[in-house]
Amino acid sequence: MGQKTALGSLLKAIGNSGQGKVVPGWGAVPVMTVIGLLLLVFLVILLQIYNQSLLLQGFSVDWNGN
């Protein structure tokens, strides 16, 4: 048998603490909502740059490779 160490006990407690359990209430929904909204804003900004509807000073978009 191996020895029990403080680090091993800590990692086991962290790794198995939430396995198979459902968090009551809203859980991670607010965090995932914020992440989803930030991703949406990022994608909209990329789309506006691609369509040249968002103009940036000193930044030209040339898709012809010239």
Swiss-Prot record:
GO terms for biological process: photosynthesis; protein stabilization. It is found in: Cellular thylakoid membrane. It is a single-pass membrane protein. InterPro entries: PSII_PsbH (IPR001056), PSII_PsbH_sf (IPR036863). Its main location: membrane. GO terms for molecular function: phosphate ion binding. Keywords: Membrane, Photosynthesis, Photosystem II, Thylakoid, Transmembrane, Transmembrane helix. One of its GO terms (cellular component) is plasma membrane-derived thylakoid membrane. The chain crosses the membrane at residues 27-47. NCBIfam families: PRK02624.1. HAMAP family: PSII_PsbH. One of the components of the core complex of photosystem II (PSII), required for its stability and/or assembly. PSII is a light-driven water:plastoquinone oxidoreductase that uses light energy to abstract electrons from H(2)O, generating O(2) and a proton gradient subsequently used for ATP formation. It consists of a core antenna complex that captures photons, and an electron transfer chain that converts photonic excitation into a charge separation. Belongs to the PsbH family. PSII is composed of 1 copy each of membrane proteins PsbA, PsbB, PsbC, PsbD, PsbE, PsbF, PsbH, PsbI, PsbJ, PsbK, PsbL, PsbM, PsbT, PsbX, PsbY, Psb30/Ycf12, peripheral proteins PsbO, CyanoQ (PsbQ), PsbU, PsbV and a large number of cofactors. It forms dimeric complexes. This is Photosystem II reaction center protein H. It comes from Prochlorococcus marinus (strain MIT 9301). The lineage of its organism: Bacteria, Bacillati, Cyanobacteriota, Cyanophyceae, Synechococcales. The gene is psbH.
